[in-house]
């Protein structure tokens, strides 16, 4: 099979690594990719926002499957444009990608199908939103409706903070994404990420993870796209997975089909596990980053076989096998992240750091004058497996400490909740 992978992050490097291991693969292309992905695939200078150019490339190279990594192209309808030319693609249609592209759409779907989630209001004017905040009180959560690269959510502990977040949305801090907002109740519990592989009709559980959103040790500082993750998530017991499928995933699949937008691709549910059970925080319509990296470390099966089954509507006849071990990834970021990251600093020792049970996935990297340099905010993902989360953590940090990059930083406590649980038991 000839496969084209779209994207350039650590998530896409993990997907490329796993796809490259498949006996089904003839040739893997990636656009635009990064130096790490370049070790697994031929990099192509394609503008992935130019759907006609992507389509033409697929026709020229006889691409059998396109795998879409990031959310932007999906929400923009790249899967529809490729399917219109009879090109097989793993990823939801534009209509189905609204589950990520519009938080308000998803909240309304939850209300219609009795899917447990936080109480909410949808607003497209500042005065009404502020009135709702004043009436409800804090703590309260403010979300830009559209795509904001994981940075459009404010957990406001005071009404003043909530009002400032609303001002930011309506003043254009998130562009068109903030033209409408969702204001919702503050939920308490433990967060978890739950993934399903979907073919429009069937949804199969595809692993659990927990990530660390805040930039600093001890979960302090501003939110990021994610500073690390581990899998599996201890809070997602077999009973909790069964409830999540029954109460959240299956009604969503049914609802989307009834709306004429059956969901096929990866459905990523951000959950709050409360004392009353699982509640939906939000949906993403692609693999998480950095959650994908730990899932790929644990996946025993051939990823390409599973993606084909999803594209061909064959998941009812498919099962998924996992390695009986944990995985943990630590994000190395450039100084200045999540604000304006410093680019161009040289990174040494990456090859020497990888080893048995350790993979280093590239995100914001580039080659400059033969040297590996930082070229983004989140730059490397040091990913390790182990019998326990604690063992994976030890391996990951030992590898990370072999990387020579004075201008990079990371959190030193990724996996702390799970490790504390393991020690207590």
UniProtKB/Swiss-Prot annotation:
User: What is a single molecular function from GO for this protein?
Assistant: ATP binding
State where Mg(2+) binds: 282, 284
Known InterPro entries for this protein? Answer: ATP-grasp (IPR011761), ATP_grasp_subdomain_1 (IPR013815), PreATP-grasp_dom_sf (IPR016185), PRibGlycinamid_synth_ATP-grasp (IPR020561), PRibGlycinamide_synth (IPR000115), PRibGlycinamide_synth_C-dom (IPR020560), PRibGlycinamide_synth_C_sf (IPR037123), PRibGlycinamide_synth_CS (IPR020559)
Q: Pfam family example for this protein?
A: GARS_A
The broad enzyme category this protein falls into is: ligase
Name the cofactor(s).
Answer: Mg(2+); Mn(2+)
Which positions does UniProt annotate for ATP binding?
133-193
Q: Locate the ATP-grasp domain: which residues? A: 107-312
Q: Keywords in UniProt for this one?
A: ATP-binding, Ligase, Magnesium, Manganese, Metal-binding, Nucleotide-binding, Purine biosynthesis
Query: Which reaction is this enzyme known to catalyze?
Result: 5-phospho-beta-D-ribosylamine + glycine + ATP = N(1)-(5-phospho-beta-D-ribosyl)glycinamide + ADP + phosphate + H(+)
Q: Which family does it belong to?
A: Belongs to the GARS family.
Q: Which HAMAP family match?
A: GARS
The protein depicted here goes by the name Phosphoribosylamine--glycine ligase
Q: Which gene encodes it?
A: purD
């Amino acid at each position: 099979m000839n496969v084209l992978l779209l994207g350039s992050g650590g998530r896409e490097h993990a997907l490329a690594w796993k796809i490259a291991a498949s006996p089904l693969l003839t040739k893997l292309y990636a656009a635009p990719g990064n130096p790490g992905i370049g070790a697994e695939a031929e990099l192509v200078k394609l503008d992935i926002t130019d759907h006609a150019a992507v389509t033409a490339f697929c026709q020229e190279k006889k691409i059998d499957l396109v795998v879409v990594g990031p959310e932007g192209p999906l929400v923009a309808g790249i899967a529809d444009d490729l399917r219109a030319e009879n090109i097989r693609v793993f990823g939801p249609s534009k209509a189905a990608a609204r589950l990520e592209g519009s938080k308000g759409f998803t909240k309304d779907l939850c209300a219609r199908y009795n899917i447990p989630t936080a109480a909410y209001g949808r607003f497209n004017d500042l005065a009404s939103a502020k009135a709702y905040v004043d009436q409800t009180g804090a703590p309260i959560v403010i979300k830009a409706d559209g795509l904001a690269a994981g940075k459009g959510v404010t957990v406001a502990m005071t009404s003043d903070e909530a009002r400032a977040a609303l001002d930011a949305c309506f003043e254009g801090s998130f562009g068109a994404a903030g033209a409408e907002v969702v204001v919702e109740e503050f939920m308490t519990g433990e967060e978890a990420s739950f993934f399903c592989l979907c073919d429009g009709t069937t949804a199969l559980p595809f692993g659990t993870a927990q990530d660390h959103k805040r930039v600093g040790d001890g979960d302090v500082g501003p939110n990021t796209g994610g500073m690390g993750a581990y899998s599996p998530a201890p809070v997602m017991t077999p009973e909790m997975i069964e409830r999540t499928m029954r109460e959240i995933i299956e009604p969503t699949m049914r609802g989307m089909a009834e709306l004429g937008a059956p969901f096929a691709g990866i459905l990523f549910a951000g959950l709050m596990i409360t004392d009353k059970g699982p509640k939906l925080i939000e949906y993403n319509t692609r693999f998480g980053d950095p959650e994908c990296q730990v899932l790929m470390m644990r996946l025993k099966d051939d990823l390409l076989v599973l993606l084909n089954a999803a594209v061909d509507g064959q998941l009812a006849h498919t099962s998924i096998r996992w390695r009986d071990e944990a995985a943990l990834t630590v994000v190395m970021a450039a100084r200045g992240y999540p604000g304006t990251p410093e680019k161009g600093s040289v990174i040494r020792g990456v090859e020497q750091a990888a080893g048995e049970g350790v993979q280093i996935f590239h995100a914001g990297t580039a080659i400059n004058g033969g040297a590996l340099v930082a070229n983004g905010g989140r730059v490397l993902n040091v990913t390790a497996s182990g019998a326990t989360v604690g063992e994976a953590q030890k391996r990951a940090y030992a590898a990370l400490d072999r990387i020579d990059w004075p201008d990079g930083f990371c959190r030193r406590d990724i996996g702390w909740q799970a490790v504390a649980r393991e020690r207590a038991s």
